[in-house]
Amino acid sequence: MQPPSPASLPTAASSPAIEARHVTKHFDGLTVVSDMSLQLGRGEILGLIGPNGAGKTTMFNLLAGSLKPSSGGIFIEGQDISSQAPEQRIAHGVARTFQIPRPFPEMSVLENVLVGAQKQTGERLFSNFLRPGLVRREEKAALEKAHVMLEFVTLSRLAHEPARVLSGGQRKLLELARVLMADPQVILLDEPAAGVNPPLLEVIMDRVVALNAEGKSILLIEHNMDMVSRLCSRVIAMALGKLLDQGSPADVSANPAVVEAYLGGGA
């Protein structure tokens, strides 16, 4: 696996793929994220790190659309998408994974990937009767694409197995394949290394690098600093709901304030 070279990647300020501007989030009077701004550059792999309680998961969910900011905004190409739900953000090319994937256990691996297919005419009841030819063509194209995605994530041999037989790492690869069915340009990865054995983690990292080489912009939350340092050209560290530091993985991890935040728990 060849990790991306920081010198070869655009800076976030050059052309952000997605950005948060002065975002604050309150829960019942408790401020979990306070005046946070960040930009994910086009073609960048950005790491978001911090101790438990730092607010990074809330920040991630604000970017993904699972939460709406109390103030500030989330923007794509200058458009405020703060009020849009995750399924609406897919239309803007933004998709996410979850720390704990929950596939449909009795459906096959292939069928789980097909769930991610977007804008299928056959989803509308009467289209099956009025436009059967179009429905069949779209279903065929989606099936072919799903097989390509399974090949990409190295799960082709398990295509017809029920998803319940997959290991934790394989479920993360399955979820990545499902996300890719939507052709996202911005991919938000929620702790992709959590619960994954070392061989499968290498596969996941290799796939992330391959996606980045295709021009995908990727933001990941991760506690595995080895993964962060190998994948990310830039890292943002949070503590107590605020920006603590940003820069290269080496510089941020060497910052005494970041070290203290981790040792102190950050909450």
Indicate residue ranges for each PLM-predicted region.
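Conserved ABC ATPase "signature" region
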Residues: 125-158, 206-209
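The feature captures the beta-strand-to-loop junction immediately N-terminal to the Walker
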Residues: 49-51
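Conserved ABC transporter NBD signature motif
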Residues: 72-79, 91-92
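Helix-to-loop junction immediately C-terminal to a conserved catalytic motif
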Residues: 64
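A short, surface-exposed alpha-helical micro-motif characterized by mixed small hydrophobic
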Residues: 228-230
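Catalytic Walker B motif of ABC-type/P-loop ATPase nucleotide-binding domains
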Residues: 187-191
